[in-house]
């Protein structure tokens, strides 16, 4: 039957979607000499110089001992080292490592990442946090929501004065920087600037649904670079980038400069993901100054916070081809959550709403399937009679459909319309940080064992995937069997294949699919009872 072929196509499409990164990895780029986030000199390219501001004078500079500056806000606690302005800690107050109440806060800059000098600036191949004398203005900052505070750092390297003004906000995860280079020498300077971030792995190494990856965004859109082996060799996209980041489905650490003509590169070294954006040909005339505005984002991938950053940082939430479907579904999910206060229940309500919207189409599909079921004996006879003449068999089948006024695609079209909705919801749930550590049923009934306490994690006891497989099997039994024996055998194994595939799915996705199956069974059963 035609509708069976579509069911099979949907199932295989899901398998391709889930295993896309494994089946079709991005084309491997050959490593380039400058691919690694390194500290090597490279020839600078000239570009038209902007009108120069007055240089910071050497007389105004006086080195001070390095110190650790703590910035405390309602959203995070950060520790900045005044020697070069590198981060040593960035703990998110609203997010913990696990679901346990006493679990440590998510710290985007741990000891491993700290060793790679996140937010450090490399000037002409020289790390400024190592080879520059620094002074600092200001101390610890305690910021309330709506407030902002600035740390001013200045460094001297020969005739050059480097100045970093880092502004922290109490209600965003963005660090705004005003960077300047002053030339007190007698000749113009051409510089190469590297802006860097470094972060430890943001997700488990074996989590294929939530990988830690390098991300770059430019005129051609989002460029994702994943795979430890590939990143260990270093990657360097050829096109200019507007921002670069290390991210998972839920968190992002990135650089968003005001200029949009920087070159990106990324490397995995010593278990730490490093991303840099290079600015070539930064000219500073004699006695002049060159300025650059930069934004750094360190935080959760929540749209309202990402939208505060320039250059479409919100594009880091990548729903793929079904973006136009996923976004409204996420809004509906949040709408239901605002009323029920439980994302598991919100997923169920959203699933019911989707089924109600497509109810008329589903009814039409079931009706068409029933008509096709009645024709199965006649179709079987035609297949047997014209098994050696496929063209004649198809002609006779079309005549049979015409005689009984049956559209063989009638059961397929309603299902095809629903495919974008399913894939859109799949992507929406997979990339929604709201489901991270969001509980549905905290404990297994009648026990103290934790169950479905985190909708972004798999079912620890595999109960929901097994029930989901059983519902698929039941639904299959309620559907007319295909006339093609090979197709029938494939369909017989689909519940088993789906069950194994869903074993490691985030439980929120399994809940959606399970509820969808249960409603479909109820709808089909209602149709059968109505007919009888």
UniProtKB/Swiss-Prot annotation:
Xref: CDD domains: 5TM_YidC_Alb3, EcYidC-like_peri
Subcellular location: Cell inner membrane
Transmembrane segments: 6-26, 339-359, 410-430, 490-510
Topology of the protein relative to the lipid bilayer: Multi-pass membrane protein
InterPro entries hit by this protein: Membr_insert_YidC (IPR019998), Membr_insert_YidC_N (IPR028053), YidC/ALB3/OXA1/COX18 (IPR001708), YidC/Oxa/ALB_C (IPR028055), YidC_ALB_C (IPR047196), YidC_periplasmic_sf (IPR038221)
GO CC annotations, alphabetized: plasma membrane
Alphabetical keyword list: Cell inner membrane, Cell membrane, Chaperone, Membrane, Protein transport, Transmembrane, Transmembrane helix, Transport
Any one GO molecular function term: membrane insertase activity
Coiled coil regions, renumbered to chain: none
Single biological process term from Gene Ontology: protein transport
Function, as annotated: Required for the insertion and/or proper folding and/or complex formation of integral membrane proteins into the membrane. Involved in integration of membrane proteins that insert both dependently and independently of the Sec translocase complex, as well as at least some lipoproteins. Aids folding of multispanning membrane proteins.
Subunit field text: Interacts with the Sec translocase complex via SecD. Specifically interacts with transmembrane segments of nascent integral membrane proteins during membrane integration.
Family named by the database record: Belongs to the OXA1/ALB3/YidC family. Type 1 subfamily.
Listed name of the protein: Membrane protein insertase YidC
Lineage: Bacteria, Pseudomonadati, Thermodesulfobacteriota, Desulfovibrionia, Desulfovibrionales
Name of encoding gene: yidC
């Amino acid at each position: 039957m035609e509708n069976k072929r579509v069911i099979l196509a949907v199932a295989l499409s899901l398998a391709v979607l889930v295993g896309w990164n494994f089946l079709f990895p991005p084309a491997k780029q050959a490593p380039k000499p400058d691919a690694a986030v390194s500290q090597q000199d490279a020839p600078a390219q000239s570009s038209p110089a902007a009108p120069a501001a007055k240089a910071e004078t050497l007389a105004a500079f006086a080195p001070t001992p390095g110190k650790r500056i703590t910035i405390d806000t309602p959203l995070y606690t950060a520790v900045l080292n005044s020697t070069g302005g590198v981060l040593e800690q960035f703990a998110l107050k609203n997010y913990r490592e696990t679901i346990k109440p006493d679990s440590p806060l998510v710290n985007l800059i741990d000891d491993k990442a700290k060793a790679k000098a996140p937010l450090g600036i490399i000037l002409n191949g020289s790390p400024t946090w190592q080879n520059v004398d620094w002074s600092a203005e200001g101390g610890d900052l305690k910021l309330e929501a709506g407030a902002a505070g600035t740390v001013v750092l200045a460094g001297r390297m020969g005739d050059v004065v480097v100045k970093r003004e880092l502004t922290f906000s109490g209600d965003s995860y963005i660090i705004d920087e005003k960077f300047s280079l002053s030339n007190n020498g007698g000749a113009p300077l051409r510089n190469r600037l590297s802006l860097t971030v470094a972060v430890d792995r943001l997700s488990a190494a074996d989590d294929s649904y939530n990988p830690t990856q390098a991300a770059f965004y430019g005129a051609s859109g989002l460029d994702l670079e994943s795979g430890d082996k590939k990143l260990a060799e270093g990657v360097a996209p050829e096109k200019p980038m507007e921002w670069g980041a290390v991210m998972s489905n839920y968190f992002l650490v990135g650089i968003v400069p005001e200029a949009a003509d920087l070159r990106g590169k990324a490397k995995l070294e010593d278990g730490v993901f490093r991303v840099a954006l290079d600015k070539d040909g930064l000219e500073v005339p004699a006695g002049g100054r060159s300025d650059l505005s930069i934004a750094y984002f360190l935080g959760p991938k929540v749209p309202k916070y990402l939208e505060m950053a320039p250059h479409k940082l919100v594009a880091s939430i990548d729903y793929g081809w079904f973006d136009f479907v996923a976004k409204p579904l996420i809004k509906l999910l949040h709408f239901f959550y605002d009323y029920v206060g439980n994302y598991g229940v919100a997923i169920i309500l959203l699933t019911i709403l989707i089924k109600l919207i497509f109810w008329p189409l589903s009814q039409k599909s079931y009706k068409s399937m029933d008509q096709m079921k009645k024709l199965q004996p006649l179709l079987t006879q035609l297949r047997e009679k014209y098994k050696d003449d496929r063209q004649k068999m198809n002609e006779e089948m079309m005549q049979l459909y015409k005689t009984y006024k049956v559209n063989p695609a009638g059961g397929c079209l309603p299902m095809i319309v629903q495919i974008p909705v399913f894939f859109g919801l799949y992507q929406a749930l997979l990339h929604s940080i709201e489901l991270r550590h969001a509980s549905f049923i905290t404990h297994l009934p009648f026990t103290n064992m934790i169950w479905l306490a985190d909708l972004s994690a798999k079912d620890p006891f595999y109960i929901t995937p097994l029930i989901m497989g059983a519902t698929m099997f039941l639904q299959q039994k309620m559907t007319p069997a295909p006339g093609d024996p090979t197709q029938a055998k494939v369909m017989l194994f689909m519940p088993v294949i789906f069950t194994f595939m869903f074993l490691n799915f985030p439980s929120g996705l399994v809940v959606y699919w399970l509820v969808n199956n249960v409603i479909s069974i109820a709808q089909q059963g209602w149709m059968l009872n109505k007919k009888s």
